[in-house]
Amino acid sequence: MKTIATGLVLCASLLVHSQTPAPKSAPPKTSPAKPSAAAHKAAPGPRPSLLNPASLTARAPADFKAKFSTTAGDFVVEVHREWAPLGADRFYNLVRNGYFTNAAFFRVVPGFVVQFGLSADPAVNKVWDNAKIKDDPVVQSNKPGSLVFATAGPNTRTTQLFINYGDNARLDGMGFAPFGTVIEGMDVVGKIFPGYRESPRQDLITNQGDAYLKANFPKIDKIKLAAILPAVAPAAHPPSGVKPAAKPSPKPAAKPAQH
């Protein structure tokens, strides 16, 4: 069984494996059954914006939160753009445009990481496969609960992410730059189904999407919805040196006239 105790080489191998291309000895593809007209009508396609990665270039706020509603429960992450600006911007655009809807937690290594970020839609995976962003400097450590982009080498970040289960500080020197952290629901993250570990093949998820996972990994946990939480405005305070207006004293109750 692979564990983090095997050292730096294993950690590098595990995370590089996360985005390696399909092996040459891939099994032959089977032709899926054609969906009925009714089923086709009931399954809308992805947002047009998701099919055009170059259009998703919004700058993320300095700090923001995103809520993940999953089949294991809900958790909230808080992102700090100054930690990794390019990673924060990419994550912000993915969440805002519904990229993670129905995406699976396809790699769960207890004590190490839980990984996700391949779309349930093969058409979306195809266009994002080469939408790489440059690396950010690593300014935060890979502590438990930190949110990080997976990579297959320098400047290869696209859409795959992982949450650290353990203290994986050894990943800091490999270029894995945390840009956020789980602030609510880490217990939920810890309950994500680990039974399949690294069995789901990422090349088949990429090419077949959710159909492959449904057919082969029925217990896999998925993201139902990820959304940016609205910013909470701070309570208003009076200007410095200005005292708040005094509340008027209540008037004494009128006494009944004496007879």
Residue ranges and their predicted role:
Residues 1-19:
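Sec-dependent N-terminal signal peptides
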Residues 19-259:
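Cyclophilin-like peptidyl-prolyl cis-trans isomerases
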